[in-house]
Regions:
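Bacterial N-terminal signal peptides that target proteins for export
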Residues: 1-8
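C-terminal motif of bacterial Sec signal peptides marking the signal peptidase cleavage site
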Residues: 16-18
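Active-site recognition of the HExxH zinc-binding catalytic motif
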Residues: 93-105
Length: 143
């Protein structure tokens, strides 16, 4: 196979990678006042500090949205972008989980601080365990 034949495939891959994350039906969102309180709690448990005002928030219609790991309730992107599924936009654990990604400025879920001391995973969360929206009864979405 010659290099010119590979060029269209390589360009398509590069273009797809350059497009970044796109959850679909999202809208910019003004964070509710309680988010500042949650941000402060997340700073306190993690020992990290950040600028709440730099975060750009988006809400995605529905109970979850497509992401690299399957279906997500929330997702953080570099550049201080947080996407939240509409059904989870007022769920403290989901929102704070994404806030913690922003404070860390990275993806991934190291046990410290996600598992301890912040307890911001499905397995470790000790706060409100409200019933899942009906669309999620087949399993929890990723964050």
């Amino acid at each position: 196979m010659s290099c010119p034949r590979l060029l269209p495939t390589a360009l398509a891959i590069a273009l797809f990678a350059a497009c970044g994350f796109d959850p679909g039906d999202e809208s910019p969102m003004t964070p509710p006042a309680v988010y500042r309180e949650w941000w402060e709690r997340t700073e306190a448990c993690s020992g990290l500090a950040g600028d709440f005002a730099r975060v750009r928030w988006s809400v995605v219609a529905g109970p979850s949205f497509p992401c690299a790991s399957g279906r997500c309730a929330g997702h953080w992107e570099p550049g201080h972008r947080i996407y939240l599924a509409e059904s989870w936009a007022m769920n403290e654990m989901v929102v704070r989980h994404e806030m913690l990604h922003d404070l860390l400025n990275r993806s991934g879920h190291p046990d410290v601080p996600f598992g301890t001391p912040c307890t911001l995973t499905w397995a470790t969360w000790q706060g409100d365990r409200a019933p899942l929206p009906a669309a999620l009864t087949h399993g929890m979405p990723d964050m």
